[in-house]
Structures are given as structure tokens and as C-alpha cells.
């Protein structure tokens, strides 16, 4: 028995050893003599959820086994020195720190005992900490540094320098040749990290912002306080637009440690500073040409004066990387030419033996810093410089999550940064990318993307992954600041199965193909400066998809730019959402569809709207709710190449100041509109008016002499004009808004195209069913079947289509459900399905109606395109139906100008949209869509009317006429949400189960309101009722749709972080076949259908629950707790008999601007056994933008300032960097109850939110908690005026100071004109957006109107005890702030001086006479100036100073 057990143990041990051997990540590969043996490393082993294709060639990493035969440390040796490594010779040694060993390196002591070339290779499998020596700079010279899996190197402010073998003295060459073999993959000299930790901490700041004082003098923004040695031990490297690769200088320094006097070196040019350079960054480091070095990784050749060489840093294997305050210089081997990799020739009999090499000439990924498959990479406040040669890129990331902030990257390279495949999350914040332009020959080289070879064009950031966040980055000298290059189905290149942009595949049994989802870019406030080497055609953004099929929908959100953009998207749509463009902005390139939505465009080169897209090739271009600046008195011509499927609702205005008085809230119609001739259409425009001036609306048409003028109704801010269209055709209406107090300025609003139809007759109808015998009769119209593949007949379908029967019911009538029970779609996603049908050749005008069922496979948008005779009708429209099936009705007009007898209709989808039936009308058909005219309570009185043609005519009443359409000729179809299929995969057996669901009936007669639209109308109604640049980036949370297992205890998710547990209850998905309940819907939308609701408004919805079991169940509804909304249900619990249904009613009120995406639980409990199951359903409701915010959406960041009354923080709100002020609520001001005070707070904040002026900070919103009022405003990147002059000690010129005060006075003038006082004027509250005196806006006022919510300081009350008028107090505060700005210091004993009736006099007489006069007028007790007077005086002074500066420039 014992022998049996022993044999069994031995067998288990043998199996264990074999399993360990098989599980090894590395494999040894033998090579020919003279070469290092290689290790084969599974480089993608840590790339989760993706299995690589072994045949792709990129799955294995081969690296030389340089750690073989290394000298190992003594066990437990604590210090890295000669004694710790038995066998150490001191000449070209290879040392290994073993696993479990923790060593420290006192680099000074170590270098004392080692020769320069003593350390050939250092391999780290344990932990090595390099200590910081504050008294002396030290470095670690090494040829090869390798961190093995699990190893860690932590260095504090010391340097690693890599020496190359050719630099070794000839006396040592013979010994070197014995120790060194050939590295075929060119990793060394350099650093190789194979799955460990690299932590590099510099001890001091490296980069500073500076400004030029003269040719040889500059001033730092903050003092240089880190100097420990004499000045000649340091060197300053200057980076500007004219010197993007830096210029080295020695320097002397003033006592303030900010003023630097530059001295030419013996080895650098140190050219004079150029006055034309707008940006200057400097790097101060130890002088590497003397005896010391700064904290950096560099080539050893720099120190010893050899010619520059190359090294590289290669990091892989899920390593952790943290680098801060480090200088990485003169590394990088991969040139900016086509890649040429070394290839291995394996033995035909042994895959672990290499018998030869095909040597490459340009090995990829040997960059200054290359990181792959590492999920934790942070690089901040570093300097990375490549100056020796033209490389591909100093930074390359592959399959990693990377955070870069406040770095300076300088190179002459194809790209400053390349985000390779799999780098789905990279954040670049406030980095400075300097680039010396690449040669035209190199940039124009055509590389091979299939070989992962790209990024040579002169890019800032080059990305092949969509999830790149760039915020406040500076790009200097590139041809393209940011380039996105998308390659569909990346698995062909990377070898990853299912590798496209995550999430990129579906688990559906019907849709096994990979799906390319829409892509959202995140680019905030990029800044670009050209250099002398920049091409004449440069772009801030370049998007390219290589003509890939299928196309997708790209969205660029909230881009703020001064520069052009370019794109090449032959098969895709591009949407700019929330674009703010000015200066040199234009567009160039091609896209299948281009949308510009909710945007502001003001380009200096813009003479008309057409110029924005004059170099754009697109099948459909649309402007939606977008503001476009024009020059005064200039007429802008609307774009005329619109097609069906695109929208155009642009708002033009001549000056941004006009928005201070009038804002356009909405127009109707706001999408292309169709109407039956003889019907009434109420054309309207709704305004938000702050000014009391009279505003007139002049309605006119480009294609007629029609013109009518009416006044805006002051009670509701609307202009409504009822029109009757008698003649068939197209009409382009517009309205001109003029303000009586400023006739030079006006709006022009172009309405979407209005199409007027006569009545047509039903010609034919077809139903998509796999049968040639059936036909359907609907309201007297025959819908035939028989559309077959490759069968010549009345209707033919292309062979790449498939029939799907048993589609879910999407209406409430059996008659309609029969019509939509079957459909066709493409076998392969996005392949066009073509239907050939007969048409009336005698009729020139026809209408075609298509009926689709959208059965979504996920929550993503699905793109739909429709063509007739290869001409686009409907292009790449985004359809979304949540998780329920939905019916879509699309109708368009077709002119049969060639008298064709048959036509080809094609459509493309990703495979989840089915064409179920179609109808053709000709001659005289009743219009399918009858718009509902807009009613109004009162008819505006026309002030003048001129009607030269009867085409549209005004009507004396707003009562709508009845359409001449008869009910028997209408096609009434419901628009519901249906059952969706739950897809469950168990091994190779997959079940696909449908449950029928129903929704409330909604007819197609009013398809402008229900979302099903005709012709050029989008499927989903667009509600452009207000312009708001802060748009949301996401709609649904992915975790709302996870598949859950069946635990006995399940937690309900709530955004308010409340957790509800069901103890002893089994969880089942709502569509699980084992659940005894069925539901009429799984998502409650409260009738919104994707649109947004008003806050503080009650919404209602209902849910029908059916008991499908044979027992009585007790049903209980458990609602989430969420302070952003109030949801109730009635009844919340009840008993439900077998096979019976009951409807429960829900009510919802949203309390603030929020996305109320919640789960709620339905629990079913057996009335006798008390066994219980529960499931989750969903509430998806989003509010419109309001001034009241959801506190949970505000992410509080670093503190800016605080006092006993309030705190100010930087915060994030919906992806936007903002400022958050939190005011304590136990203020002495609150004499009323707490609830009354809160109500007053929201009322006043709502008023402030309506104030818009370029010199006041934008108010985003507010909220409160139990102890604080929260106020969210615009973020100022340059801080406050106080911090500029008191903390940063920046010196301002006289004209700069005048410009700052002029902006302040203009802001105060606006506030006083709107009866807003308590402006709280002080340097802390003047936020800087620029210090360039010629910029339009330099200062914005913050905290106006907020002071009343804080406790007044007692001294402040005494100071102003004699002041009766708050406006005078504001002027006084302005005078004090002006005085403080001129002296650049705060007046002392200010309160005592004022109480004694005096004013500050220190250095007052030294001020400019005009300035002194303005200041004294501000604090004159008898006759104090108004801000209008102050603005005029400052404007005059500013103009004089500007003219004087221009004269000096011309003289020089």
C-alpha cells in the first residue's frame, strides 16, 4: 500500500514538473556561433481577453540571453558593491541581482571602485534602489541594463548612462571581444524591461516657462531654486518655435533667480533670442560637458565627447513604469524610414534552433522609450530629447495604458508620439511636443500599414487607437498635430483574434462577424505653433481610415481650435460636435458624410460659409444648429449641395456681443420638412431676450420675392408666421433678426429645406418574405411577395442577402405585424443589399416608402445608408433603439427623369436592420406624413408685408387647415419597442429565444414628432432647442447591460451608492427562459424615446407584468435611491394569479441636470414556500441642460484656495475641467429658514446662468449638500491676476496692465447694465486667459454676485460704511485693484486709510498721468466714475499705447 502511495506521489510530482515546464513563458533558442542565444518571450501573454494568432509573426519577442553566466550576488547582500558579487573581475562583468534580494547602491562609493567599462551588463531579478546623494551628482555607466520578470529598479535623482562597444579603448578591445557576442535585434546599448518595475524619481524641476527680455536675456516664470553648485555646473537649453530641438547656453543669474543672462558655450550655438517667438520653454540641467550630470538617462558618449550614438529603452511584459523629473536624451535607434526587421531562419527539424539570420537595417520599436502591454505607465514632468538624427518617434506605446503630463518632448522625427495597436487608453495632458520638421522626401514616403509601419509624416501624436485623450497639449512644428489612422479588423495585422476597437465583437449567434462601432475622439484645447520647417499646409487634426470597409461614424467632441483639420474617410461619416473654431480654421479632405453640430466657427479667412468646406469632398454635408461669424454687411450663401438625409440649420451672426442681448433657443422646422400643397405651416423662431430692445423678424425666401416682417412677441420671445404653400417644389426660407438699438448687427437664420408635394397614388407594394405565393392586403393596398434571389420577375434581390422569418411584433395590430414579420438583411455586415423593382415610367415623380425593423444586438448605434440607382438618399444615419426592437418608416422622393421601367434600391447595415416591406407611389398619392402645425396663443402683427408671388402666402390666423389627405389612403403604422433576443452560449449549443413585448401605439401620420421621418428627415428627431457647448460624451453605462450569473445574493446598483441586497433570492435575467414573469418592456423611457426632459417635471410610464407560471406570485417592486431624481411606483406590491397580467404605473421627476440610468428590481415570491427570484429592469431618462447640476457628476480635484468661508478647487464635470467654489451654508446672511435660503440661491444662480459676456466667466451650474453651496464655473488655465503678480512675480508691461484693466471694466460695465452689483472686484477674482495685449480676451471676472452668500468681513463693512450705492463700491474696488496692478503689490494698511478718509498714495505720483487720473476717479467720494466712462478712458489709453508700440516696431 505504501509503495502504491509513493508511486502515486512520484507520478503527481512528475506531472507537476511537466506542467511547470509547459507553462514557462520563456523558451531558450540556440543560435550560430558568435551570436547570443535567444529567449523566446510570449509578449502578448498579459493582453487579457484576446488570444493571439501564432502565425501572425508578432506574438513572440526574441531577445538576447545576455544574463547567461552572470555573476550572482551573495545571498542576503544588502549593498551593491564589489564584495557583494563573488568572482567580480572589474572588467566587462555581467552581474545578476537574484530574486528575493534587496540591494541599495550608493553610486558614489560604487563608482570609486569600478572602472568606466567595468559593468558590461546588469541584470535585476530582485530589487535595486539607487540612493540619492544631494552633495554630488553621480551616474551608473552600463552597456546593458535588463530588468527580468519580477525585478525592480528604483532610482532617486541619479543617472544611467549607456556606453557602446566601439567607444572602448583599444587596449581593452581584446578582452571585450571575449565577453561580447552579436545582438541580432539591436536592443543594446540600452534598457530592457521584461515584466518588472521601473521607478525613476528626479529630485528637482527640469522645465520652466520663460519670456524674452532681449537677445541674450530671459526671465523664468518661477525662480530657479534648485541650484546646488556653481553656475558653470549647469546648462540651460532653450526651446522655441525657431529652435524646436533646443539651444544650449551657459548663464549668469540675477539675485531673483529668475533673470538669466545667456553666455555662448564652446560646444553650442546659443543664438540670440528671437522676438517673433511666441512660446519659450527652457530646461535647466547639470552641465554634462563639465563634471556633473542632471537626473537623466543618456548615452555615455555625451560625457566623453564621442560622436552621438544611439541607445533605446524597451519595456514589455505588463511592467509598471513611473518616471518623474527625468531627462532622457540622445536615445532612439529606429530611423524614419521603412522598417527593416531582422528575421530568423529556423532549422527545419528543430523550432528551438536558429541556423541563420536575415539582418535588417532599421529594426522597429527601438525608440527612446518604447512600452508595450503595460497597464500602469505614468510619465510626468520629464524631458525627452532626440537631437542626433531623424528617427521614427521618441515615444511609442503598444497595448498599454499611459498617462503623460507636463512633459517636454523634442525630436526630429516622423511623430512625436505613436500610439500603436491596443493602446486604447492614453492620456496626454499639458505636454509640449517640439518637432523639427522631417524632410519632404521622408514625409511623402508610402509605408505599409499592414506591416504596422506608419507615422512618418511629421505628426505630433499619431494614433491607430481611438481612445486617446489630449487636453491642453502644445504642438510645435508638426505637419499634423494629431493624426488618427484607423485600420479595421486589426487581427489581420496583430494576430489577435477579435482585435478591433473595443468593444468590437458580438456574442450573437446571428452576428458572429466583428462589428466596427462608432468612435468618439476626446481632444480639448490643442495649441499649435508652426516653425520654419513646417509645411505650408499643416493641420491640427488629421483623420484617416485608409478607405476601410465597413465605414463607421467618427465624432470629434468639444474641439477648440485655431487651426485647420484634414480627413480622408471615403466610406465613413465624420461629425464635429461642439466645435469652437476660429483664426485659421478650415476643412480639407473627403468623407462620405460630414456633420457640424452645435458649433461656433469664426475664421479670419472666412468670407462665406461655403469656404469652410470648399476643399471637402462629401456626398452629404450638414450644418446643424451652428453659429457662423460673418463680416459686417456681408451676405453668407448657404451650402447648396445638401442631399436627402442631411440637415441644415445654421445660425449666422456678425459679432459675439450680440449674444449678450439675444440668443436663439429653437426654430421650427428644424429638420428638412415635407408638406402637402395647400396645408398650413407655422414657421417660428424662439428667442431668449435679455435686452429690452424691440426685435423684428423678416421672413424671406431665396427662390421667391416673398418677404414679411413682424415684431417678436415680448411675452414669449417668439416670431411665428403661418404660411400656406400652394405650389409643389422646394423652398429655402430664412429669417433676418434686427435689433432696433443696433441696426448694424443682425442674425440670419436659414431654415431647412421645405418640400411641398401634390397628392400621389399607390402604385405597388412589396413584402420581403421567402415565398412567391403570399400577398398581403392592407387598407385596400396589395403588398406582393415574390422578391427572390436570381429570379427575373417583378422584384429581384441580390444574392448576398438573407431572409429572416419570425421577426418580433413591433405593432399592436396583427394586420401590421404580418406585414413586418419577415425581412432581409445582408449576409456580411455593411455589404449593400440591392432590390430591383418595377416603377411607373410614365410618371416623372414618385415616392418610395421603406419599412424597416431594427432588432439591435447591443446598445451601440447602427448605421443605415440607402441608395437609389447608386445615388445616396440616406447616408450613415445612426439608429439606436436601446435593447428593444423598433419599427422605422423612411420615405423619399424619386424623380424618374430617364423614364426607367425598373430601379435599383440598395441599403447597407451592420446586419441588425431588416427591410420588411416597401411601397411605391406615383401620379397623385396622399402624403404619407402630415405635419402638425405649431399653434400659438396670439398672432404676431406684421409690420410690413410684400408678397410678389403666391408660393408661400401668409394667413390671417394660426388655426391649422385640415390636410386634404383622406384616411383610407393613409398608411397608419405604429412605432413601438419590441422584444429583444437574449443570446446565451453554452459550449457549442446556443439557444435564441424571443419573447413578445408590446408598447403604446404611436401612429406614423405625424412622423415629425414620433421619430419616423420622410425623405431627408432623420429617423430620430433632433431637438435643437438650445445651444450648449458642454455636450455629453456618453449616453449609456456599459454595466447596465452586463450578463449576470445566478447567485443567491445579488446587489442592485444605484448611482447614489445605495446597496440593496436580496437575501435568499435567486437572480434571473429578465429574458431568461426560466423566469416565470414576462414584461411589456425592459427599459422605461417615460415616453421620451431618446429625447431629453425638463427638470422638476413629472413624467409617467407603465409596465405590464405577466405571471407565466401556474402558481400565485407575490410581486414586489424595489426602486433605486437616487437624489438626482424621485421615482415612485403604484402599486409597489401585489399578488398576481397564474397566467394573469397587471399594469403598474411609474412616475419620475428629475431634480437636476442628470443622466438617470438606473436599475430597479422586480421580485417574485411564492406565496406558500416563500421561495423568491428577482430580476433587473432599467430606467433610462436624461434631462435637458439646466443651471442645477447633479453633485455626483462633479469630481473634485486639487485645492486652489480656501478660507473660513469657502474653498475653491479644480474639478471635472462631464469631461470638462472646471472651477468649483464651495460656500459654507451656516452663514450669518441666512436669516430665513434653510430651505428658503436654498431656494433663493438657485433662483439667483439661474439668473446668473443667463448672463453671457466674453469678459465674465461662464457659469456652468450649481448644486448643494448639507453644509455647502456648490458653484461651478469656467476654468482659467493661467490662474488669477493676483497669483501672476504676487506669487509668480511676472513683470507686466504698461500696455499689458491697461489691457487687463480694460477687459475688467468692460465686464463690470456689462454686469451693471444688467443690474448685477456686488461684483467682488479684486485681483484674486480676475482670471487670466491670456497676457498677450493684442488678444481679444485677456481677463474674465469671476465670483460676481456670489459675495452675498458669504459672511461679510467686519473690517470690510467698516470700510464701506458710508457707501450707499453698491455700484459705487464696485467702482471703488476696481480702483484699488487697478492701483495694486500698477504697483504689483497690495497696498498696506488699506482699511485704516479709508476709515480716515484717505486713499493710498504710495508711488501714485510715479504712475502715468492718464492712469493716475482714472484711479483717482474710481475712489473719488464726491463724483465717482461709472464703468462706461472708465471703459472709454481705458480704451483710448490702450489705443495710444498700441499705436506707440507699432511705431517703435516700424522704426526698428
Swiss-Prot record:
Recorded topology in the membrane: Single-pass type I membrane protein
Subcellular location: Membrane
Main location: membrane
BP GO annotations: regulation of developmental process
Transmembrane segments: 973-993
Annotated GO CC locations: membrane
Domain of life assignment: Eukaryota
GO molecular function: ATP binding; protein kinase activity
Pfam short name (any one): PK_Tyr_Ser-Thr
Protein name in the entry: Probable inactive serine/threonine-protein kinase gdt6
Amino acid at each position: 500500500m505504501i509503495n502504491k502511495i509513493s508511486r502515486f506521489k512520484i507520478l503527481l510530482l512528475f506531472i507537476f514538473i511537466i506542467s511547470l515546464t509547459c507553462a514557462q513563458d520563456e523558451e531558450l533558442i540556440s543560435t550560430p556561433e558568435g551570436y547570443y542565444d535567444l529567449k523566446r518571450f510570449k509578449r502578448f501573454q498579459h493582453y487579457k481577453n484576446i488570444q493571439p494568432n501564432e502565425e501572425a509573426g508578432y506574438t513572440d519577442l526574441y531577445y538576447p540571453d545576455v544574463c547567461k553566466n552572470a555573476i550572482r550576488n551573495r545571498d542576503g547582500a544588502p549593498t551593491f558593491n564589489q564584495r557583494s558579487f563573488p568572482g567580480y573581475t572589474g572588467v566587462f562583468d555581467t552581474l545578476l541581482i537574484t530574486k528575493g534580494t534587496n540591494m541599495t547602491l550608493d553610486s558614489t562609493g560604487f563608482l570609486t571602485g569600478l572602472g568606466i567599462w567595468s559593468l558590461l551588463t546588469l541584470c535585476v531579478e530582485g530589487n535595486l534602489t539607487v540612493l540619492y546623494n544631494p552633495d554630488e551628482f553621480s551616474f551608473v555607466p552600463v552597456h546593458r541594463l535588463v530588468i527580468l520578470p519580477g525585478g525592480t529598479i528604483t532610482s532617486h535623482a541619479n543617472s544611467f548612462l549607456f556606453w557602446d562597444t566601439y567607444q572602448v579603448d583599444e587596449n581593452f578591445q581584446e578582452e571585450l571581444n571575449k565577453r561580447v557576442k552579436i545582438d541580432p535585434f539591436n536592443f543594446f546599448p540600452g534598457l530592457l524591461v521584461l515584466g518588472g518595475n521601473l521607478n525613476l524619481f528626479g529630485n528637482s524641476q527640469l522645465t520652466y516657462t520663460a519670456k524674452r527680455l532681449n537677445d541674450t536675456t530671459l526671465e523664468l516664470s518661477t525662480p530657479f531654486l534648485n541650484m546646488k553648485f556653481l553656475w558653470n555646473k549647469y546648462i540651460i537649453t532653450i526651446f522655441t518655435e525657431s529652435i524646436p530641438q533646443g539651444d544650449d547656453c551657459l548663464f549668469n543669474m540675477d539675485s531673483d533667480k529668475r533673470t538669466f543672462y545667456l553666455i555662448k558655450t564652446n560646444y553650442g550655438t546659443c543664438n540670440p533670442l528671437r522676438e517673433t517667438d511666441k512660446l519659450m520653454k527652457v530646461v535647466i540641467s547639470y552641465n554634462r560637458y563639465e563634471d556633473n550630470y542632471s537626473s537623466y538617462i543618456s548615452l555615455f558618449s555625451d560625457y566623453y565627447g564621442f560622436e552621438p550614438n544611439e541607445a533605446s529603452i524597451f519595456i514589455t511584459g505588463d511592467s509598471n513604469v513611473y518616471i518623474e523629473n527625468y531627462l532622457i536624451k540622445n536615445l532612439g535607434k529606429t530611423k524614419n524610414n521603412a522598417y527593416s526587421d531582422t528575421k530568423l531562419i529556423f532549422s527545419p527539424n528543430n523550432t528551438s534552433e536558429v541556423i541563420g539570420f536575415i539582418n535588417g537595417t532599421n529594426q522597429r520599436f527601438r525608440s527612446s522609450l518604447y512600452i508595450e502591454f503595460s497597464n500602469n505607465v505614468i510619465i510626468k514632468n520629464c524631458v525627452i530629447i532626440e537631437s542626433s538624427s531623424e528617427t521614427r518617434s521618441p515615444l511609442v506605446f503598444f497595448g498599454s495604458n499611459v498617462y503623460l503630463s507636463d512633459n517636454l518632448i523634442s525630436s526630429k522625427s516622423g511623430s512625436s508620439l505613436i500610439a500603436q495597436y491596443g493602446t486604447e487608453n492614453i492620456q496626454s495632458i499639458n505636454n509640449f511636443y517640439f518637432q523639427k520638421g522631417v524632410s519632404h522626401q521622408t514625409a511623402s514616403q508610402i509605408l505599409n500599414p499592414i506591416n504596422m509601419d506608419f507615422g512618418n509624416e511629421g505628426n505630433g501624436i499619431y494614433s491607430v487607437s481611438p481612445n486617446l485623450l489630449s487636453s491642453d497639449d502644445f504642438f510645435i512644428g508638426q505637419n499634423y498635430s494629431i493624426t488618427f489612422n484607423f485600420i479595421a479588423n486589426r487581427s489581420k495585422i496583430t494576430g489577435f483574434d477579435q482585435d478591433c476597437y473595443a468593444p468590437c465583437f458580438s456574442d450573437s449567434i446571428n452576428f458572429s462577424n466583428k462589428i466596427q462601432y462608432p468612435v468618439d475622439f476626446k481632444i480639448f484645447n490643442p495649441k499649435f505653433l508652426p516653425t520654419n520647417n513646417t509645411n505650408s499646409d499643416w493641420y491640427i487634426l488629421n483623420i484617416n481610415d485608409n478607405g476601410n470597409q465597413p465605414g463607421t461614424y467618427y465624432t470629434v467632441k468639444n474641439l477648440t481650435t485655431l487651426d485647420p483639420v484634414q480627413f480622408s474617410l471615403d466610406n465613413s461619416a465624420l461629425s464635429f460636435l461642439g466645435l469652437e473654431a476660429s483664426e485659421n480654421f478650415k476643412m480639407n479632405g473627403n468623407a462620405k458624410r460630414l456633420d457640424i453640430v452645435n458649433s461656433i466657427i469664426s475664421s479670419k479667412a472666412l468670407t462665406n460659409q461655403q469656404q469652410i468646406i470648399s476643399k471637402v469632398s462629401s456626398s452629404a454635408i450638414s450644418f446643424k444648429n451652428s453659429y457662423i461669424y460673418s463680416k459686417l454687411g456681408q451676405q453668407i450663401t448657404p451650402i447648396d449641395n445638401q442631399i436627402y438625409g442631411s440637415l441644415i440649420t445654421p445660425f449666422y451672426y456678425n459679432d459675439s456681443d450680440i449674444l449678450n442681448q439675444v440668443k436663439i433657443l429653437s426654430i421650427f422646422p428644424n429638420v428638412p420638412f415635407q408638406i402637402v400643397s395647400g396645408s398650413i405651416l407655422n414657421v417660428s423662431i424662439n428667442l431668449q431676450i435679455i435686452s429690452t430692445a424691440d426685435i423684428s423678424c423678416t421672413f424671406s425666401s431665396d427662390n421667391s420675392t416673398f418677404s414679411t416682417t413682424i415684431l417678436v412677441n415680448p411675452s414669449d420671445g417668439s416670431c411665428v408666421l403661418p404660411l400656406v404653400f400652394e405650389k409643389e417644389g422646394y423652398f429655402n426660407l430664412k429669417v433676418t433678426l434686427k435689433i432696433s438699438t443696433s441696426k448694424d448687427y443682425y442674425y440670419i437664420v436659414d431654415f431647412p429645406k421645405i418640400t411641398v408635394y401634390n397628392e400621389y397614388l399607390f402604385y405597388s407594394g412589396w413584402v420581403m418574405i421567402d415565398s412567391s405565393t403570399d400577398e398581403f392586403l392592407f387598407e385596400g393596398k396589395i403588398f406582393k411577395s415574390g422578391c427572390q434571389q436570381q429570379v427575373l420577375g417583378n422584384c429581384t434581390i441580390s444574392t448576398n442577402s438573407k431572409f429572416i422569418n419570425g421577426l418580433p411584433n413591433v405593432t399592436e395590430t396583427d394586420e401590421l405585424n404580418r406585414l413586418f414579420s419577415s425581412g432581409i438583411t445582408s449576409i456580411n455586415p455593411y455589404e449593400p443589399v440591392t432590390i430591383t423593382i418595377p416603377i411607373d415610367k410614365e410618371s416623372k415623380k414618385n415616392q418610395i416608402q421603406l419599412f424597416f425593423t431594427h432588432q439591435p444586438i447591443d446598445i451601440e448605434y447602427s448605421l443605415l445608408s440607402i441608395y437609389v440607382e447608386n445615388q445616396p438618399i440616406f447616408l450613415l444615419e445612426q439608429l439606436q433603439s436601446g435593447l428593444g426592437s423598433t419599427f422605422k418608416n423612411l420615405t423619399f422622393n424619386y424623380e424618374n427623369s430617364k423614364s426607367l421601367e425598373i430601379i435599383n434600391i440598395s441599403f447597407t447595415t451592420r446586419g441588425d436592420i431588416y427591410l420588411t416591406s416597401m411601397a411605391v407611389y406615383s401620379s397623385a398619392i396622399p402624403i404619407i406624413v402630415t405635419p402638425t402645425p405649431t399653434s400659438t396663443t396670439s398672432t404676431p402683427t406684421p409690420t410690413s408685408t410684400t408678397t410678389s408671388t403666391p408660393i408661400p402666402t401668409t394667413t390671417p390666423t394660426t388655426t391649422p387647415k385640415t390636410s386634404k389627405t383622406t384616411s383610407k389612403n393613409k398608411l397608419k403604422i405604429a412605432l413601438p419597442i419590441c422584444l429583444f433576443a437574449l443570446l446565451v452560449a453554452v459550449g457549442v449549443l446556443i439557444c435564441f429565444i424571443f419573447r413578445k413585448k408590446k408598447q403604446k401605439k404611436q401612429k406614423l401620420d405625424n412622423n415629425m414628432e414620433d421619430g419616423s421621418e420622410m425623405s431627408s428627415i432623420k429617423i430620430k428627431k433632433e431637438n435643437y432647442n438650445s445651444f450648449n457647448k458642454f455636450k455629453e460624451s456618453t449616453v449609456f453605462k456599459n454595466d447596465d447591460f452586463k450578463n449576470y450569473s445566478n447567485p443567491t445574493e445579488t446587489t442592485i446598483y444605484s448611482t447614489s451608492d445605495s446597496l440593496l441586497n436580496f437575501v435568499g433570492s435567486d437572480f434571473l435575467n429578465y429574458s431568461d427562459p426560466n423566469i416565470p414573469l414576462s414584461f411589456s418592456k425592459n427599459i422605461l423611457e417615460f415616453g421620451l424615446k431618446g429625447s431629453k426632459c425638463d427638470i422638476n417635471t413629472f413624467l409617467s410610464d407603465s409596465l405590464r407584468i405577466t405571471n407565466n407560471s401556474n402558481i400565485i406570485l407575490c410581486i414586489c417592486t424595489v426602486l433605486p435611491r437616487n437624489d438626482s431624481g424621485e421615482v415612485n411606483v403604484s402599486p409597489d406590491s401585489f399578488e398576481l394569479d397564474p397566467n394573469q397580467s397587471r399594469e403598474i404605473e411609474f412616475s419620475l421627476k428629475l431634480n437636476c441636470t442628470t443622466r438617470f440610468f438606473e436599475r430597479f428590481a422586480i421580485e417574485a415570491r411564492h406565496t406558500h414556500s416563500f421561495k423568491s427570484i428577482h430580476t433587473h429592469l432599467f430606467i433610462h431618462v436624461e434631462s435637458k441642460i439646466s443651471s442645477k447640476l447633479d453633485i455626483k457628476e462633479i469630481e473634485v480635484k486639487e485645492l486652489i484656495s480656501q478660507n473660513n468661508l469657502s474653498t475653491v478647487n479644480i474639478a471635472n464635470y462631464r469631461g470638462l475641467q472646471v472651477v468649483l467654489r464651495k460656500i459654507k451654508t451656516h452663514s450669518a446672511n441666512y436669516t430665513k429658514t434653510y430651505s428658503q435660503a436654498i431656494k433663493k440661491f438657485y433662483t439667483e444662480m439661474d439668473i446668473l446662468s443667463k448672463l453671457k459676456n466674453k469678459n465674465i466667466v461662464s457659469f456652468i451650474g450649481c448644486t448643494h449638500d448639507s453644509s455647502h453651496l456648490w458653484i461651478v464655473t469656467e476654468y482659467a488655465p493661467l490662474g488669477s491676476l493676483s497669483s501672476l503678480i504676487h506669487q509668480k512675480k511676472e513683470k507686466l508691461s504698461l500696455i499689458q496692465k491697461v489691457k487687463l484693466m480694460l477687459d475688467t471694466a468692460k465686464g463690470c460695465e456689462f454686469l451693471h447694465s444688467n443690474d448685477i452689483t456686488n461684483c467682488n472686484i479684486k485681483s484674486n477674482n480676475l482670471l487670466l486667459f491670456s497676457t498677450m495685449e493684442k488678444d481679444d480676451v485677456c481677463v474674465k471676472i469671476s465670483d460676481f454676485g456670489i459675495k452675498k452668500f458669504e459672511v461679510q468681513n467686519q473690517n470690510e463693512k467698516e470700510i464701506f460704511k458710508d457707501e450707499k450705492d453698491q455700484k459705487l463700491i464696485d467702482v471703488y474696488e476696481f480702483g484699488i485693484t487697478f492701483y495694486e496692478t500698477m504697483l504689483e503689490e497690495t497696498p498696506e494698511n488699506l482699511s485704516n486709510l479709508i476709515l480716515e478718509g484717505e486713499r493710498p498714495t504710495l508711488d501714485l505720483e510715479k504712475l502715468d498721468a492718464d492712469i493716475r487720473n482714472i484711479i483717482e476717479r474710481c475712489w473719488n467720494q464726491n463724483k465717482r466714475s461709472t464703468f462706461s466712462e472708465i471703459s472709454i478712458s481705458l480704451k483710448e489709453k490702450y489705443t495710444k499705447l498700441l499705436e506707440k508700440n507699432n511705431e517703435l516696431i516700424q522704426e526698428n
